[in-house]
């Protein structure tokens, strides 16, 4: 992709560990995990971490989690707040500050064969995706550290961890 000068290429995969997902994880270095702020989404996170660790050991040692994006967030519910807190506790700074709110426009857009940004660029959901994209582009690379396994850390945190190791 470097020949085309892309900064990012997103490969959307199902959460199950099928052939498509294994091949995608073998072809990339970074994984961004969207997590719905719902109860059952948390159950799959542990399995996903195990799968990433397994692929790192067997196929792609460079594979790591560089971002987690909280989606379908509903600030009116305790559940969304609890899921967000648990995800932030497990993944730390790799979780983006911007969240994608539950939105009718985000739900409607695929039915029209469009992204929410094309369907309704001024909607809350579209603006949230813009904000998340800006955050990704400006926060710097989150690379794995030997002490963090498959979870990336900011360059500042990596430097602190290196100092602690010395």
Task: Show where each model-derived region lies.
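C-terminal lobe/tail of nucleotide-utilizing enzymes
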Residues: 57, 61-166
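Conserved catalytic-core segment of NTP-binding enzymes
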Residues: 2-104
